[in-house]
């Protein structure tokens, strides 16, 4: 399977060419960039242009971009208006969210990538038909804007009442949106289970997020290394291999003291090898 690393691993550090060089030197051929403004400020043309110049001269490929979740650089702590959700029921506010996501998509004009990973709502959000109507309108506009730039929008299963595997499939069936999925294995472990989520989503999976947790907390633990993870990785990999070639093995990990940066990148390479051989 193709190996991809999400820059979520060092999302609290500003993304620069030094980090990208280290990823390439670790033997990872492609990345997903996590769009958080303290990490990648999609409004900062200087940062985007610097990275674009580096990518044009590098073998490292930009596989995907994780859509922004907040408009600030402090994980939404500046206030509720900084939270970006396409389920926002107030049209004027939702249009601002769509505009912010479009700003991130503009990166494709400088650094081409295949996929934008998009959340449907926020963590722990309750189900409401009106929220899905809001999301439908937003996704129509975002998808059109993305396609004009050669990008496909993928919906990710996240731990809320709108984005279980079953709800995502139902949403696409009802709206007839021609979208596919990013299967987040860690999030599935917190909801219906990895096997169930995979079975429901498998025909539309185009990318993955691989990480572990205790079934309750979205802690982005390191598979096979971190203590407290509850995913059966031999079984999970057996499932994922049935669709090999349809999607990559994409690690979305968190920085932990036991895996200090940048040395942790060497462990990333070993982790890919372990997952492929279990």
Tell where the protein language model's regions lie, with residue ranges.
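Flexible, glycine- and charge-enriched loops at secondary-structure boundaries
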Residues: 41-44, 48, 87-94, 125-132, ...
């Amino acid at each position: 399977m193709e190996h991809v690393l999400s820059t979520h691993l060092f999302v609290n550090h500003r993304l620069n060419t030094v980090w990208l060089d280290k990823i390439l030197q670790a033997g990872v051929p492609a990345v997903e960039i996590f769009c958080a403004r303290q990490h990648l400020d999609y409004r900062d043309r200087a940062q985007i242009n610097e990275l674009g110049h580096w990518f044009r001269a590098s073998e490292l490929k930009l596989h995907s971009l994780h859509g922004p979740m907040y408009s600030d650089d402090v994980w939404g702590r500046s206030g509720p208006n900084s939270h970006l959700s396409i389920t926002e029921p107030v049209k004027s506010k939702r249009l601002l969210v769509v505009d912010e996501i479009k700003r991130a998509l503009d990166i494709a004009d400088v650094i081409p990538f295949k996929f934008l990973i998009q959340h449907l709502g926020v963590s722990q959000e309750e189900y409401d038909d009106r929220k899905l109507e809001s999301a439908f309108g937003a996704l129509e506009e975002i998808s059109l804007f993305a396609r004009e730039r050669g990008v496909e929008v993928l919906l990710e299963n996240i731990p809320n009442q709108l984005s279980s595997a079953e709800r995502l499939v139902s949403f696409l069936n009802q709206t007839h949106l021609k979208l596919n999925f990013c299967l987040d294995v860690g999030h599935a472990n917190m909801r219906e289970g990895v096997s169930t989520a995979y079975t429901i989503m498998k025909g539309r999976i185009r990318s993955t997020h691989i990480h572990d947790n205790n079934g309750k907390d979205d802690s982005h633990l390191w598979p096979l290394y971190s203590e407290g993870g509850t995913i059966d990785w031999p079984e999970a990999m057996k499932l994922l291999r049935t669709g090999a070639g349809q999607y990559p093995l994409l690690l979305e990990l968190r920085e932990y003291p036991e895996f200090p940066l940048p040395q942790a990148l060497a462990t990333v390479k070993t982790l890919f090898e372990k997952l492929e051989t279990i």
